[in-house]
From Swiss-Prot:
Family label: Belongs to the peptidase T1A family.
Keyword Cytoplasm: yes
Name of protein: Putative proteasome subunit alpha type-4-B
Organism field: Arabidopsis thaliana (Mouse-ear cress)
GO cellular component, one term: cytosol
Major location category of this protein: cytoplasm
GO biological process assignments: ubiquitin-dependent protein catabolic process
Keyword Manganese tagged: no
Pfam families: Proteasome, Proteasome_A_N
Subunit-level organization: Component of the 20S core complex of the 26S proteasome. The 26S proteasome is composed of a core protease (CP), known as the 20S proteasome, capped at one or both ends by the 19S regulatory particle (RP/PA700). The 20S proteasome core is composed of 28 subunits that are arranged in four stacked rings, resulting in a barrel-shaped structure. The two end rings are each formed by seven alpha subunits, and the two central rings are each formed by seven beta subunits. The catalytic chamber with the active sites is on the inside of the barrel.
Length: 208
């Protein structure tokens, strides 16, 4: 029965449902987690990488993090072909907008709903992630504290047993001392150091 009403995003079922939108929301729920947290001195985005391989060029392989322009970045979850269209649209829109309201964090979904958040999570196990964020988030948290919280949330909600640098993407948006907005994506080596620093993984044993 539903097949008659799921061919377009604008066709409602007799119950008032948009099946294509529901399918897209389901795809997001099964995707790797993406978490955004607002700090008093910046924004931190962290995501779970589903595609991991020793053959990947890790320095250039980005699955979750995208730069929109010099002062806007995003983390995505769901079907990447859809995300790429939205990212390209956002890049065009960002070129036409220059009002400054400080650091902000927004989350949107396929239904067109969006809103400002202090901390948000999408993807697999997002309800558990939101629960931890509600409990541990502080309004005056620094960027360093927010990075620690983001890593903690992802490590506790991932489906896999352990969080490693190969399964993680982390980006920060902040002001430099010269008051320029900087978008920084952590390298695998930097991620490994962060995971060790915050007790998520053990330091690698030195070979003699």
């Amino acid at each position: 029965m539903s097949r008659r009403y799921d061919s377009r995003t604008t066709i409602f079922s007799p119950e008032g449902r948009l099946y294509q939108v529901e399918y897209a929301m389901e795809a997001i729920g099964n995707a790797g987690s993406a978490i955004g947290i607002l700090a008093k001195d910046g924004v931190v985005l962290v995501g779970e990488k589903k595609v991991t391989s020793k053959l990947l060029q890790t320095s250039s392989s980005m699955e979750k993090m995208y730069k929109i322009d010099d002062h806007v970045a995003c983390a995505v979850a769901g079907i990447m072909s859809d995300a790429n269209i939205l990212i390209n649209t956002a890049r065009v829109q960002a070129q036409r907008w220059d009002r400054n309201h400080g650091f902000q964090l927004y989350m949107s979904d396929p239904s067109g709903n969006y809103g400002g958040w202090q901390a948000a999570a999408v993807g697999a196990n997002n309800q558990a992630a939101q629960s931890i964020l509600k409990q541990d988030y502080k309004d005056d948290a620094t960027r360093e504290e927010v990075v620690q919280l983001a890593i903690k949330v992802l490590s506790k909600t991932m489906d896999s047993t352990s969080l490693t640098a190969e399964k993680l993407e982390l980006a920060e948006l902040y002001l430099t001392p010269s008051k320029c907005v900087k978008y920084h994506v952590h390298s695998p080596d930097s991620l490994t150091k962060l995971l060790v620093k915050h007790g998520v993984t053990q330091p690698a044993a030195e070979t003699s």
